[in-house]
Amino acid sequence: MQRRIMGIETEFGVTCTFHGHRRLSPDEVARYLFRRVVSWGRSSNVFLRNGARLYLDVGSHPEYATAECDNLIQLVTHDRAGERVLEDLLIDAEQRLADEGIGGDIYLFKNNTDSAGNSYGCHENYLIVRAGEFSRISDVLLPFLVTRQLICGAGKVLQTPKAATFCLSQRAEHIWEGVSSATTRSRPIINTRDEPHADAEKYRRLHVIVGDSNMCEATTMLKVGTASLVLEMIEAGVPFRDFSLDNPIRAIREVSHDLTGRRPVRLAGGRQASALDIQREYYSRAVEYLQSREPNTQIEQVVDLWGRQLDAVESQDFAKVDTEIDWVIKRKLFQRYQDRYNMELSDPKISQLDLAYHDIKRGRGVFDLLQRKGLAARITTDEEIDAAVTTPPQTTRAKLRGEFISAAQEAGRDFTVDWVHLKLNDQAQRTVLCKDPFRSVDERVKRLIASM
């Protein structure tokens, strides 16, 4: 499948402080954040004009699910648009607090762990054909996903009883199963719950919940681009060496703690391989595969960065990727800070900096400041992101959903939508079922809109 439907769901950490002290509980902050949403959507679970879904998830975490996208830059743009949507809610909520005489600063973090050790996720969705053998896909994909943090981890300072250590991934410590149908209780790497949000006879949705939330656009593109390409190669029957892991859960933690990528992890049958070995195998297959594949500039960019990052890890010289990979950008920032102020990695100020890197408020968040200085690479533009806040992807089913929502809101009509249904809540209860996520034009939807 060379054209694939993809989406990213991001849960955001939330807190409210007043002069540095916590002011409101996460529940209370979430209520202020979503008050404007509830006022027009009558719910804290809504679909937006850009085709995305915005809702309050378990544990008072605002969650943004992008609309269906069918190319990488489109997906990165709509992922960033989610930050803008949440930032707007944050600014509105702070104003409400001020108006009510409460005061306080609200923070939304695009990260995966809080100070209490709780974890929240960044889930990737990839449409795959139903006819494929799912067990083979998960078998080949699992070693790739366990070691992928080497190229696209967000980085984290982990405080251990002995000392603080810098890790590749925020999510690795919180994953407890390889493949499972649960998402919260056991936190698997691949979630098998079969909800295709499409024609179930043709498709299923691969739900990957092991990835970190990325701030850097180039890293997000690398994360989803490599996974999508590996899926495409599996579907095309490309053979891969067997890297079945003896214990994926132990392996994912071992990989996260090894910035050299060289520490051997145990494979099934007693063999060993390093994260670098495993990633090199997938990368070399990708380079080979691209020689016979239809040319695609975005995929070529992904494979180029993949190779440069693996070279950087191998040589431990990150100069050629230090604006493109989140964990590399963050580690360089910490090292400069430590050198300048002569402090240990365990210093609380480094932990504060770690958190501030993920603050989505422009002008305040550390990553935003780095990006403005040209220290973090861009894939999109501010204008494209602003457009994606209100405009759905024009090449997928999201266009139909977005146009329907816009028309219904402008006509003052009551409506209900989900990923596949568009419904006018009138006497006739007219509903259109959109089972094909690739389809951006539908006469039935046009007629439904015209009837308003």
Swiss-Prot record:
Coiled coil: none annotated. It is an enzyme of class 6 (ligase). ATP binds at R53, T66, W419. Pfam families: Pup_ligase. Keywords: ATP-binding, Ligase, Magnesium, Metal-binding, Nucleotide-binding, Ubl conjugation, Ubl conjugation pathway. One of its GO terms (molecular function) is magnesium ion binding. Mg(2+) binds at E9, Y55, E63. The active site is at D57. Pupylated at an undetermined lysine residue by the prokaryotic ubiquitin-like protein Pup, which leads to its degradation by the proteasome and thereby constitutes a negative auto-regulation. Its EC number is 6.3.1.19. It catalyses: ATP + [prokaryotic ubiquitin-like protein]-L-glutamate + [protein]-L-lysine = ADP + phosphate + N(6)-([prokaryotic ubiquitin-like protein]-gamma-L-glutamyl)-[protein]-L-lysine. The keyword ATP-binding applies. Pathway: Protein degradation; proteasomal Pup-dependent pathway; Protein modification; protein pupylation. InterPro entries: Pup_ligase, Pup_ligase/deamidase. Signal peptide: none annotated. It comes from the Bacteria. Belongs to the Pup ligase/Pup deamidase family. Pup-conjugating enzyme subfamily. The reaction mechanism probably proceeds via the activation of Pup by phosphorylation of its C-terminal glutamate, which is then subject to nucleophilic attack by the substrate lysine, resulting in an isopeptide bond and the release of phosphate as a good leaving group. This is Pup--protein ligase. It comes from Mycolicibacterium smegmatis (strain ATCC 700084 / mc(2)155) (Mycobacterium smegmatis). The gene is pafA.
